[in-house]
């Protein structure tokens, strides 16, 4: 048993999302969004480096010895699966272990908007799931792949860095390929996947112009493409795609988005009202003729109005979704406020702006009784 497994076992037992190990501080657990130290001494440099090198392959050890960062998946002796990032910093080495649930969560369990399941019914086009690091994008995509795997007969090719959730083939065939192990880059992975008779291609991250371009080609040629971007709203997602590609391809990119982008789902993880978990709250854009025209005429700043008016199509602004979750007493109002994009407008619904304990969409006044959701 690797020595590092003891910390991972403790983290799993505590239900944490991440285990952080760094020189000069005790091991820390990410619990419901907060970083909590465990009762242990500060880790020493030589000690932690020994813990880490025990779980590396020969090739990974060579790269790490040269000062390179590492991203890989790891299965502990207890059977726990983790996504790992190993790095060096000013005081020495460090590592972050993201816990991956043993079972792929369903869309229903994640309580995502019903429109997310309907996106899995499309046969071609692009769906983007976006958000900052650690907002559950990979989990949402895994749930979508699982839904496709159970409800349709498809050839699904998933390109990941690293492989997180493992998908046994059910009604569909699921082929999972890992960056650095099976493919040299996401762009090359998409290029290869298109020669493998795919129905669905998942691209773990649209991180550069070449990958975006290849993913666009796949979506235009009759495949359903799922991908992620580190953007925090639907508008920023569209602008990022347009700006990522060469200026001379700008018109072509806008045309692609107008014709082949199906939806953008942007999510954040907000503390639940009881403080014992986090809930995904989503902004949803569904492509319409009106939004397509705004993209083509470079008036993306007007898209939020379309989201606000498009609730019958499954669309919603992030702030709308946050307010609805607060009204339903499912999330902590204080934490929800920190994710609001238009905080000044958001505050109009808050009865106590100094404490932000209660939000009421009806506009009626309510005397707050505590600093938490009722």
Regions flagged by a language model, labelled:
Residues 1-374:
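Short, flexible helix-loop junctions that flank or precede catalytic/ligand sites
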